[in-house]
Amino acid sequence: MATIHFTKVHGSQNDFFLVDEEENLITEWSDEQRADFAIKLCDRKHSLGGADGILYVTKSSEVGPIGQMRVVNSDGSIASMCGNGLRTVARYLLEKHALTEAKVETMKAILDVKKATSLGFDIPTYQVEISPVKFAAETLPMHVGVEKLFNQVIPELDTELAFSAVSVPNPHLITFVDQSVLDSDKQEKLASYLNSENPYFPDGVNVSFVKRLSDDAIYVRTFERGVGFTNACGTAMSACSLIKKMLDNDTFETPLNVYNDGGRVQVTAKEDAAGEISLQLIGNATFVSKGSVRYENDIVTELTNEATAEQALYQALVKEVKEFLKTTE
């Protein structure tokens, strides 16, 4: 029997249970144990309301980073990266170590994180690096007959939509659409197919439909691999921002406002002298509640759950975003 303490968090209402492995003395858990606990705790029928996944935080395996983030989706699968989750982990670790910036180890990269100026309503806001960025088909992996997919129609997927694909490092398939396509069931059908057994994306893929709002703003809706539709996906919003900049031959260093069903973030693309691209994602890191559960005989039982006042602040931003999005339909 184990008592597990958690912090319920969200980035753009992409919600998670953040679990500190050291404080909970579960650093020796196997991947199977982490997956089973995630499946049980993240069930939307659970008394705690479930979540999109669990963010396991532990010591870094490298010298330098102040911690390591492991992401397990609600279905027990492992996510190589999660931008929205990383913002909340950044806040947790920076506050724990009394720092304003540092590095955090993720599954495939060590990334810069820092506290940022609030995007509004005094909401705790953090900036995280999204990288590495790769376009090669083998990095996704992707089998659609091209080595790099950029703004191209793939008839096997859709006869009209032009797709781009990029890994950041988790895989993303992106297309820009109008409101009528957003209102249709195209995205759900395509994403469901590509996240079941298929010859094109054998490991599945995050599928985003993007609508242009202005020269410096887009709306993104994402069907996440291992989860389904979520309020927002941080790596997807970052990847979509990059594709928009590339399609428009726009300046990389200029921030882009990205709207989603869960709120709003900002993304800036950067390219170094060697041609390597990285992305900076800025958005909320909201702590919704703190609590504990009992995990015994494969059953997760709620013990405590105390809400913070932070969600009310975030809802003010969501209201503003929804009012703005209505004007764009």
Curated annotation (Swiss-Prot):
UniProt main location, coarse: cytoplasm
Pathway in which the depicted protein is active: Amino-acid biosynthesis; L-lysine biosynthesis via DAP pathway; DL-2,6-diaminopimelate from LL-2,6-diaminopimelate: step 1/1
A GO molecular-function descriptor: diaminopimelate epimerase activity
Catalyzed reactions per annotation: (2S,6S)-2,6-diaminopimelate = meso-2,6-diaminopimelate
Coiled coil regions in record: none
Family recorded in the similarity comment: Belongs to the diaminopimelate epimerase family.
Protein name per its UniProtKB record: Diaminopimelate epimerase
Organism from which the protein derives: Listeria monocytogenes serotype 4a (strain HCC23)
Gene: dapF
